[in-house]
């Protein structure tokens, strides 16, 4: 394997990417891009303390942690409705237009996910079915801090709206003055969020999981956040539903020799600029392309506004992997099970059947991951850290629940009741059996 470097304006040499031959460097590759699913014990203790404090002391604890971690002394945790309307009115009209276009695209996609209740008549006239019911209340967590993410507002709100959730609350961290990003507020207005709170961190998760004197308890909490938010969601699961435990962003690009090196480089950068822990990986059978992307990344990273973040992410978690053929590239991608997978190949639809594990697949060189992040329609809240093997993107299904319906008449229980009672006898559950036989005796 060989690292690439770029020279900053201060002449510091910083590693950008490493190149691996999969046949020879497999173990080193997975050490480079492997992710731990464990949380730091100190973070776990801190989150546990925060959750317990909020559960016991409610608003007072939330306000104390908000002052401690966000530097804000709040008189109200909820953003006034007039602030939300003002943010939309004062926003760049072009920004509002693209928010509205994206919102309609996301709604349109999620409408295809809607499940209907069903009923059918079984043997002997028994009526069976399943009723689909939306949850009453949802809380959407929208990250703040290093960047503002109005796209996360739309992506979390749309499936909840389509599902028919009664009340959709949103929370996002404020700054030290108590202000919330106007872009996020404008997006909340477009999405028709019920109300917005200016809270962040584990204390926000706890407040909506348990409820406080002024904050409602919800049924589900969705949305990404930092490690404190992720661990808080994990710990409150059971008190509420959650979407997933989100980790740092990831992209894998599978490319053949015809792929555009600049497209690939910028797509790797796009994921890396999120966070120093983000992962960007190119897998290709073309050594020529691998070297071209490697060299272009080294040449371009220093000119990027978030170049230091990109360089750190690529150095710590990035890789270029040279494989024997495109089929092996697909197998390696499935081993990673990435959040985002781009297929920069001549015939992506022919390759799709070879892919089993990815949160979202982007077909061809012009279907860049950025399109999915903001505009296309499928949800950008995706499984990370290899969990695409068993988790799915955020969807309408996350905001509904299913109830089984069973209807037997007297005549129908008389026809099969003794067999059912006998089944219960074999499990040693006398009351189960006698509950049926009591009905048989009534005749």
From Swiss-Prot:
Active site: residue positions: 339 (proton acceptor), 340 (proton acceptor)
Residues holding Zn(2+): 271, 274, 373, 432
Biological process, per Gene Ontology: L-histidine biosynthetic process
Highest taxon of source: Bacteria
Cofactor binding description: Binds 1 zinc ion per subunit.
InterPro entries per the UniProt record, alphabetical: Ald_DH/histidinol_DH, Histidinol_DH_CS, Histidinol_DH_monofunct, Hstdl_DH
Co-factor requirement: Zn(2+)
Residues the entry annotates as binding substrate: 249, 271, 274, 340, 373, 427, 432
Sequence similarity: Belongs to the histidinol dehydrogenase family.
Stored NCBIfam families: hisD (TIGR00069)
Role noted for this protein: Catalyzes the sequential NAD-dependent oxidations of L-histidinol to L-histidinaldehyde and then to L-histidine.
Protein name as annotated: Histidinol dehydrogenase
Originating organism: Chlorobium luteolum (strain DSM 273 / BCRC 81028 / 2530)
